[in-house]
Amino acid sequence: ESHRLILGYFLFSTMTGLRISDVQNLTRKNFMDNYVSFVAKKTKLDQSIAMNKKAREIINHEPLLFEKKFADQHINDELKKIMTLLKIHKNVTFHVARHTFATSFLRAGGKVEKLQRLLGHTDIKQTMIYAHIVQADANSEIFLLDDLF
């Protein structure tokens, strides 16, 4: 059961970009319509984030999600076990979900300023780290055109 719940938390974070501390503090009361509203633990700022279809499917699929809490280290230990079971040989921690959300958002055409708000960053420099990663990917892929001409 803990594997299923922890995987649910992880996948929810890949769809919303929430920090592990914020996911851990959520209860079903934080969800209204298509939004999740909460006070960010790190910044103490109120946040209200729209949930996409996949995020809503994740919370609707698992009724115990956000009812059971785990220590951060336990979550990361369980993620390692899940990756081993799935034969994924990567060092995956919960923060990877947030990183995945950020880079996916930018690759899909999202704006850095919007991402800053979604991630709850108080300084745009924090968000620009993700923009630089996406730009580096784009720069490396420009050489794919060499084979066409």
Please tell me what each predicted stretch does.
Residues 12-13, 104-108, 117-118:
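Short alpha-helical segment immediately N-terminal to, or the first helix within
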Residues 1-20:
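Basic, Lys/Arg- and aromatic-enriched nucleic-acid-binding interface segment
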Residues 2, 68-74, 91-93:
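N-terminal core-binding DNA-recognition domain of tyrosine site-specific recombinases/integrases
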Residues 41-81:
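C-terminal catalytic core of Y-nucleophile DNA break-rejoin enzymes
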Residues 9, 21-25, 115:
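Alpha-helix N-cap/helix-start motif at helix boundaries, enriched for small hydrophobics
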Residues 40-44, 119, 123-144:
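Catalytic-site neighborhood detector that most strongly recognizes the C-terminal catalytic loop/helix
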Residues 5-6, 89-109, 131:
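Short basic/aromatic active-site micro-motif
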Residues 47-62, 132-149:
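DNA/chromatin major-groove-contacting recognition/catalytic segments
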